[in-house]
Amino acid sequence: MTAHRTPLSELEQAMPFEQRHIGPDHEARAKMLAQVGYGSLDELTAAAVPDVIKNADRLDLPGARSEAEVLAELRSLADRNQVLDSMIGLGYYGTFTPPVILRNVMENPAWYTAYTPYQPEISQGRLEALLNFQTMVAELTGLPTSGASLLDEGTAAAEAMALSRRMGKNKKGLFLVDADALPQTVAVIRTRAEPTGVEVVVADLSEGIPAEVAEREINGVLLQYPGASGAVRDIKPVIDRAHELGALVTVAADLLALTLLTSPGELGADIAVGTTQRFGVPMGFGGPHAGYMAVHEKFARSLPGRLVGVSVDADGNKAYRLALQTREQHIRREKATSNICTAQVLLAVMAGMYAVYHGPEGLRAIARRTHRYATITAAGLAAGGVEIVHGSYFDTVTARVPGRAAGIVHAARENGINLRLVDADHVSFACDETTTRAQVGGVWHAFGVEGDIESLDAEAGETLPEALLRTDDFLTHPVFHQHRSETAMLRYLRRLADRDYALDRGMIPLGSCTMKLNATTEMEPVTWPEFGALHPFAPAEQAQGYLTLIRELEERLAEVTGYDKVSLQPNAGSQGEFAGLLAVRGYHRANGDEQRTVCLIPSSAHGTNAASAVMAGMKVVVVKTAEDGEIDVEDLRAKIDKHRDELAVLMITYPSTHGVFEEHVADICAQVHDAGGQVYVDGANLNALVGLAKPGHFGGDVSHLNLHKTFCIPHGGGGPGVGPVGVRSHLAPYLPNHPLQPAAGPQTGVGPISAAPWGSAGILPISWSYVRLMGGEGLKRATQVAVLSANYIAKRLEPHFPVLYNGPGGLVAHECIIDLRPLTKATGVSVDDVAKRLIDYGFHAPTMSFPVAGTLMIEPTESEDLAELDRFCEAMIAIRAEIEKVGSGAWPADDNPLRGAPHTADALGGEWDHAYTREEAVFPAGVSAADKYWPPVRRIDQAYGDRNLVCSCPPLDAYED
């Protein structure tokens, strides 16, 4: 017998998830606290966080649960969702995700834990996958330049409207929208248009542009192809007429239909937009899915969002990179082409790989089968006396049934099928890749007719107009023909993943990005069909599990932030900003203060802030930043006084983008409120506040949060994300809503800012799980360890690099900025050199030159253990010694391992004529040959790629030596 017998009740307790999520254990924390000079986490954060903002109360959240318990709770919620066969359509369709893509992309941390490919040398796999996506979209749409994804079809259409206004001849003209466009797209366009004064006219364009509209100045035209009703029309006459009137034309096109139909580009369109959801991405109750935009080559430099291009590395080898970044929000701010930052990279990779796996012939076969099911179903209805409204359609059929529509939809539901109730007299249904013969029979039964599929298959002809059938080839590049077997596809995906650097490989200490653990338990439910297979416009009673999860997550986020109401609709942080600013705008206008349009933004703010403010119809006024990194209070006071009557809102990030807790934030908020303005607290840095302070309690009226930062949704290599907006009660009436789901927001809301009612609902179980697993105290400890880790790095590096800013007690918040400018001035070694050299040490670089040029901003998060933190610090200290060798002349300024970084495996062979050794190049201090990460390319020539813009898969001869 042992001296101590552990009670069964203790043996039954699983290790708390908090200990899985937080990297440093108790012993490591004690060492780190000693380095920083504090005795406990509470003592550290008491010194770091200003008293004026501290939250004394514990978070009122349910207690932490084990991983098994949380999965059981989620299973219970999932079981409350009823997944019927969806034939609603409207841009959301059943699809089969090839298991090789599901397992090796969607469920693979090598893909989903990567960051936006700002460091292209260690992002080559993802960039190639995105180039496949761009090539797929460009060739299917017939337009030469496609971006690397947008947020969804609705926002892509709104971006097209903005591009038309920016680049078209009639810049002040109206924007004309096809009445047969998707209703959610029309609503998103209206929401986006109103603040900037764009008039939106919706008209029936089936017979051309109405004369009364043609008499006016038209800036742009949006056509749906095929239409929401299913109609396939020859839109070329409308396109030609629009061009005669000086308007640009956008075609919202279904990519699967385009495998059979003439492309928008061939018909003369300037822009094509849409969604790639039906290319293997689950509906997920609305998202996430990759939207797309393709444009005529003359508009390439005005594209919103990311654009992947081809360049060369230092050895002249082909390499991929993000192209034309100077047009984006993080550089151009209020003059950017868009506020898009996070997009939908992971979903774009999936859609592109779906095309790679199936190839053009496979996509055509899926399209033909989908179309055949539609024609057979329609033929059976017609034979039974049901009037089919349109003679030409692809996958969607509208039937006229006077007074019977509701009854038919109800009967179909009884048969396990969701149809679309158009109005009292019309019902539509959409076929897709998953449609079966049983579903066809179920539709006939709901309409009260009978039919024989075999006989109708023999009799039913094609309904697509011969003049509109596609005749040109598409997806001709070898990548769309080489990976038909699962073995080949599996190895291709592995080969690409091996070229990338993600959290499964090592720490990604990007400041302001919060690259923390995305736990497997949190990720697992995303692929359950009860969450993945639900249509966003399914009846609410079929989504009770989802709606409960959404309500609970909204309430818990409100508790964490101190706000009264939260909307989960925004599907990116940029869209959360836009929604929050629209709420401020709506509030002022409701109070008769239409003149309040000035938005004060510190010069150090995230670039999306300014871009979002302009989209919300506001005038940006920049507030200076003081030398200590905080807002220049005197300049702020002067700007408030100057714009007192016009002041709408102040946008601040807290903690600041300089990584410090500003002590006078409450006073700043009071000054703005005294002038009649609102305070927008950007939630990008909320990982330093959870459990310690609440923006809604220290002066914030509105904030957006980043669930893909603070609440563990993975970054996906550049998306998906979720950017909920939280508001105080007086702004709640002006949150987003949705025309097709009344429960998605207030009747008085500003309209939808995302295509789906709850945005990227399919990934909300991740954040729900994180909060449930951690509980209130666990969330607080995660924050405290994040602050501890940042201060530990700052203390370790401070003897070697100046730490640029600090706050109370000489402490930083959850990130720190090290200043390389003195070293650059003395030695010529740039911040870029240090970032690339870190690759040789096996690290992704911190954030470069933001918010201060020539600096590195480091955010370790709470998830990295002490060994990894030390490995990073030791790499930085070793790099400092290398810089010293350059400064002393031991290595030439133009020939040293920093300037030559990163080094590939090619450095091990061939001639070597450098002033440093091969070993110094590839095995610097502390780097083991056994664990070495080898970058696939050397430093990429950024300027070459922009001068020689290539944004689709290069021909085979480009791969030759």
Swiss-Prot record:
Keywords: Oxidoreductase, Pyridoxal phosphate. GO terms for cellular component: cytosol; glycine cleavage complex. It comes from the Bacteria. SUPFAM superfamilies: PLP-dependent transferases. Its cofactor is pyridoxal 5'-phosphate. GO terms for biological process: biosynthetic process; glycine decarboxylation via glycine cleavage system. It comes from Streptomyces coelicolor (strain ATCC BAA-471 / A3(2) / M145). GO terms for molecular function: glycine binding; glycine dehydrogenase (decarboxylating) activity; pyridoxal phosphate binding. Belongs to the GcvP family. This is Glycine dehydrogenase (decarboxylating). It catalyses: N(6)-[(R)-lipoyl]-L-lysyl-[glycine-cleavage complex H protein] + glycine + H(+) = N(6)-[(R)-S(8)-aminomethyldihydrolipoyl]-L-lysyl-[glycine-cleavage complex H protein] + CO2. PANTHER family: GLYCINE DEHYDROGENASE (DECARBOXYLATING), MITOCHONDRIAL, GLYCINE DEHYDROGENASE, DECARBOXYLATING. It holds the Pfam family GcvP2_C. The glycine cleavage system is composed of four proteins: P, T, L and H. The glycine cleavage system catalyzes the degradation of glycine. The P protein binds the alpha-amino group of glycine through its pyridoxal phosphate cofactor; CO(2) is released and the remaining methylamine moiety is then transferred to the lipoamide cofactor of the H protein. Its EC number is 1.4.4.2. The modification N6-(pyridoxal phosphate)lysine is found at residue 709. The gene is gcvP. The lineage of its organism: Bacteria, Bacillati, Actinomycetota, Actinomycetes, Kitasatosporales.
